[in-house]
């Protein structure tokens, strides 16, 4: 069984507004309400690919209840840990029909979406212990996915704390997190880590250039550095330039680049993780897993929200 953990899930409210004007009354022309957060996204795409999984997440207020309802509708086994105070994050993703960043008072075509993200609730220590107790029941051979940011009140070592707590189990651990959260887990030897090339550059202070052979070689060099620090397999996503997988047997696979119109890259990296895990579940073949993962990430970028399983498999040709 695959279990995902999301500390700060969200309800993402996508709206489109014609000719957005700050300080004025604007009316939406389209709306979409989706659950969000790295682990939640991984669970959603796994379910759409037909892979049973369990989503564990902290839930507060009416927003948390709606997140649970939407995930249940996807066929996901939900395990919300209820927090009594506060409310789960409500995020607004604003796009103008003509684009998305301000230019002369309007949103220009070339810019990115405007996002306003909520804070989320504070998680008390007893709720962290409840999470630990849940994870201690995982069985040998299970997969545990840790991803995303954590609320500011939690210790920066929380991912490492979890891995130390479950160290007696033979789990397949996946970590998709930024700099310190990721680095702190490496000597626990996670099965897979998934930085993108920008996060890799932040860790090692270099300028990534995935478009050239020399640039990719440099990216692979730093992926090997993460492997030397303890990661078993390293998957580096590079946006429109595909992805690179470095396996625990020192094999390097380059993901195919799929063509399409990018609508929103939100959740693409999470989709890649889900597709990769689905591929491993189906064939236990790294190259196949990378292809399905790359297709899932691309299909997500070509969609408003996360892609459905049929679209992903058609793009992957599997």
Describe the residue ranges of each PLM region.
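Glycine-rich phosphate/adenosyl-contacting loop at the front of the ribokinase-like
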Residues: 1-56, 64-66
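Hydrophobic anchor at the start of a short beta-strand
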Residues: 2, 52-54, 78-79, 173, ...
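Short beta-strand scaffold segments in enzyme catalytic cores
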Residues: 44, 90-94, 242-246
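Gly/Ala-rich phosphate-binding loop of Rossmann-like dinucleotide-binding domains
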Residues: 47, 167, 281
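Conserved N-terminal subdomain of the carbohydrate kinase-like
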Residues: 48-142, 314-318
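Short beta-strands and strand-loop turn motifs
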Residues: 115-117, 141-148, 176, 196-197
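Conserved phosphate/ATP/ADP-binding segment of small-molecule kinases
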Residues: 156-249
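Conserved phosphate-binding/catalytic region of the ribokinase-like
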Residues: 213-318
